[in-house]
Amino acid sequence: LGDVYKRQGITKITATDIEYAKEMGCTIKLLGVAKDTPEGIEARVHPMLIDSNHPLATVNDSYNAVFLTGDAVQDTMFYGRGAGELPTASAVVGDIFDVVRNILWNCCGRIGCTCYRECPIKRVGEIKSKYFVRMQIENRYGTLASVASVFGNNKVSIAQMLQKRVNGKYAEIVVITDEVKERHFEDAMQILGGMSMIQEISSTIRVY
């Protein structure tokens, strides 16, 4: 399923990433994204940088939210507790009642499938995202140009490139890309990861 569904947790998110996000006016949230496109359904779960003014950025602690964009309704959000003793107990009791009703009525569900069309699943490599990339590079003439060249040769357009910290021989840079297909981005990352002038690719995070 790896080439169809993107699944990534938050274990690689660091305090430095959170600090950079804050400087950019963003926060980092673990999002599940489902999108209907002409090429198929996008289905993925991963961390994303999201603008601090976006409604999802305010969802914290035991709360969860579902943010929807419709043709007529535009943007709307459903928000509530998704963890804790009482919310969990409420969900469990609701499931028990459903099971009992189904047994009494000799059925396996009171609402049938409402699907009316078959939709292909869009492959991960074809999904477009913006990316935040943080890396440690050699602090010498020509390194930034080489990095930019690798991105360009792999159809990755750079929106911003910032040099934030210098630590002796190495400098830390942050790159924000324009929207790009994941397969092109991964090709660029593979090449950069093998270059001697790149000490480390510290983080790659999608941007909402």
Annotated model-derived regions:
Residues 6-48:
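Internal anion-binding site segments
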Residues 13-16, 21-23, 75-83, 149-158, ...:
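Short secondary-structure transition/capping segments
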Residues 9-16, 63, 83, 87-94, ...:
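Conserved active-site and cofactor/substrate-binding residues in soluble primary-metabolism enzymes
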Residues 96-208:
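A conserved regulatory-domain signal marking ACT and ACT-like small-molecule sensing domains
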Residues 21, 28-30, 43-45, 66-68, ...:
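Generic structural hydrophobic/aromatic packing signal, biased to beta-strands
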Residues 7-9, 22-24, 44-48, 55-57, ...:
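A short linear-motif detector with a strong N-terminal bias
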Residues 1-5:
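Short, small-residue-biased leader/transition segments that mark boundaries at the very start
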